[in-house]
């Protein structure tokens, strides 16, 4: 790795920045994977963000990415980029436990549809992330695998149920992550952990290979530390899966500058709620900043 590029700096990079460093030869995909795995080993015993880590597979995948780069045969913007996967998605050879104690040994033989897309894109899969049991919760607490710690505010909930994915991103234990969302499970932890996430249009991303909470309302959601990474990851994940009953063909529309000024709506009265003064002050300051 380039001596001018510190470990901390490269771990802070989003996927777009990491690709620039990889292209310029300042770091290799294997070096990035090794640094990320070392940080997971150091910090995860406290954070409980990951339940399983694919160390050997991740290093092998990163090495393959470096080889493709040397042959000018990259598979796209995710090639060589570390990525964490919520544990209710099927990853071949690993338990699809969904945060449930009785599924600790439920090793699956096939990948979820989106995992296949991520492998084809060259992403480096790091491991399975912790979650509220059965995706039925919004706190990140889990009796079987440990409560997920919020890296930005230890002692404060991470939100959930995609708690481990959000915490891993906030703690720089991964560059990208996958979560799922039925009634807020990527949006809530993203807000609580200070990262970005997207609940996509229903059917835009296949849910085949995801343990269902409610088939009609379940979504696979990209999670990242920047909006541009969300767009990049969404573009890879989106696509019709003829074996998924809720999937439909969708043409990805790239981000483009707005042609008219943005408008933001906000609530001025909380007749049925009593937010504390600090929360209300932060809310009002955010409104003022957006004006």
Region spans (language model):
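Long amphipathic alpha-helix in the N-terminal Rossmann-like dinucleotide-binding domain
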Residues: 56-63, 122-123, 132
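Enzymes and membrane/adaptor proteins characterized by extended Gly/Ser/Thr/Asp/Glu-rich
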Residues: 77-114
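A short helix-breaking turn/cap at a secondary-structure junction
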Residues: 199-281, 285-286
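Short glycine/serine-rich loop segments
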Residues: 110-237
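An N-terminal boundary/leader segment
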Residues: 1-57, 291
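Acyltransferase
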Residues: 29-33, 63, 277-291
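Immediate post-signal peptide segment of exported/extracytoplasmic ligand-binding proteins
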Residues: 65-82, 229, 256-265
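Conserved hydrophobic/aromatic pocket- or pore-lining residues that grip, position, or stack substrates
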Residues: 36, 58, 86, 118, ...
């Amino acid at each position: 790795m380039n001596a001018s590029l510190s470990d901390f700096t490269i771990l802070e990079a989003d996927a777009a920045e990491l690709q620039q460093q990889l292209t310029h030869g300042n770091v290799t995909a294997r070096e990035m994977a090794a640094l990320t795995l070392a940080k997971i080993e150091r910090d995860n015993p406290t954070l409980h963000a990951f339940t399983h880590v694919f160390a050997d597979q991740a290093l092998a995948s990163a090495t393959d990415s470096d080889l493709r780069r040397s042959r000018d045969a990259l598979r796209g913007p995710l090639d060589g980029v570390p990525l964490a996967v919520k544990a209710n998605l099927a990853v071949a050879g690993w338990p699809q436990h969904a945060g449930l104690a009785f599924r600790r040994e439920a090793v699956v033989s096939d990948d979820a549809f989106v995992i296949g897309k991520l492998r084809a894109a060259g992403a480096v899969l790091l491991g399975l992330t912790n979650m509220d049991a059965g995706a039925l919760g919004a706190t990140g607490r889990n009796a079987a695998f440990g409560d997920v710690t919020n890296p930005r505010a230890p002692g404060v909930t991470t939100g959930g149920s995609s708690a481990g994915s959000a915490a891993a991103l906030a703690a720089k234990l991964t560059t990208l992550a996958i979560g799922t969302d039925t009634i807020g499970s990527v949006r809530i932890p993203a807000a609580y952990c200070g990262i970005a996430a997207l609940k996509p249009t229903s059917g835009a991303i296949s849910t085949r290979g995801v343990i269902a909470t409610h088939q009609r309302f379940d979504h696979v959601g990209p999670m990242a530390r920047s909006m541009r990474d969300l767009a990049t990851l969404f573009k890879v994940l989106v696509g019709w899966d003829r074996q998924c009953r809720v999937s439909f063909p969708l043409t990805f529309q790239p981000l483009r500058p707005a042609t008219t000024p943005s408008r933001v709506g906000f609530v001025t009265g909380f007749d049925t709620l009593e937010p504390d003064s600090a929360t209300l002050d932060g809310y009002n300051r955010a409104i003022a900043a957006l004006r």
